[in-house]
Amino acid sequence: MVTQALLPSGLVASAVVAASSANLGPGFDSVGLALSLYDEIIVETTDSGLTVTVDGEGGDQVPLGPEHLVVRAVQHGLQAAGVSAAGLAVRCRNAIPHSRGLGSSAAAVVGGLAAVNGLVVQTDSSPSSDAELIQLASEFEGHPDNAAAAVLGGAVVSWTDHSGDRPNYSAVSLRLHPDIRLFTAIPEQRSSTAETRVLLPAQVSHDDARFNVSRAALLVVALTERPDLLMAATEDLLHQPQRAAAMTASAEYLRLLRRHNVAAALSGAGPSLIALSTDSELPTDAVEFGAAKGFAVTELTVGEAVRWSPTVRVPG
């Protein structure tokens, strides 16, 4: 039995982690894009017990005990580092909306794991690398698109290797074309990935698979070199049409944006939308339609890589 080193109490670390949009149309479970909405996580080792406080988004929806996703991620990271803590105090300051398809769960996991880096560097342990953070976080998520975007920032292409004893998750960064501007449309409606994933068929036709493969390949070119191809590159047949019935307002808004030649897609599993454009603003009537339907339409920028740091504890 391996004995884990016990971290001293009073260590404090913090992490700042971005929201993310997955899929971008055809890149199902593979393409991700970090967005400039950030959660902050502060973790302190204590003598015993567990306290969890959450300010901001999701504060009244998440558990405040060991089942909290950040706590689970911290414990997972501590175990991976070969250390443990007698007690923990965890504080979350959330700006990323929950259950909207903006990577809030991936941000919680990546933020918790990154905060562990800030703890262990104050001892003789080594922090996890970006590749290790992606692996650890994706083990929670089951797919690396949001997790990789949260770790690396910017746009990513990720993949899963199932040839070994357990899935191995990897990702590479893309240099987003500087002319591309990002807009999100966030509704009041909530949705969970688990609920909408069951709407997807177990098998798809060869024609639909071929269509999405071509569009996903084109998406990489459009994101990096040819933003004029974004409309074609964000087409999808494998998940958005199947999810439309569960989020009719989002599906209607998506159709309207695309009729206005805006390269829009469901953000992850929805119900939020992500729009990529080389114009400085969305068409006025499209914005007005979204507002009338309860969508908060906002321009964002590309999110940065997760940042973590050891923090000096301030008494009092």
Curated annotation (Swiss-Prot):
It is found in: Cytoplasm. One of its GO terms (molecular function) is ATP binding. Pathway: Amino-acid biosynthesis; L-threonine biosynthesis; L-threonine from L-aspartate: step 4/5. ATP binds at P97, H98, S99, R100, G101, L102, G103, S104, S105, A106, A107. It catalyses: L-homoserine + ATP = O-phospho-L-homoserine + ADP + H(+). GO terms for biological process: threonine biosynthetic process. Keywords: Amino-acid biosynthesis, ATP-binding, Cytoplasm, Kinase, Nucleotide-binding, Threonine biosynthesis, Transferase. Coiled coil: none annotated. Signal peptide: none annotated. Pfam families: GHMP_kinases_C, GHMP_kinases_N. Was identified as a high-confidence drug target. Catalyzes the ATP-dependent phosphorylation of L-homoserine to L-homoserine phosphate. PANTHER family: HOMOSERINE KINASE, HOMOSERINE/4-DIPHOSPHOCYTIDYL-2-C-METHYL-D-ERYTHRITOL KINASE. This is Homoserine kinase. The gene is thrB.
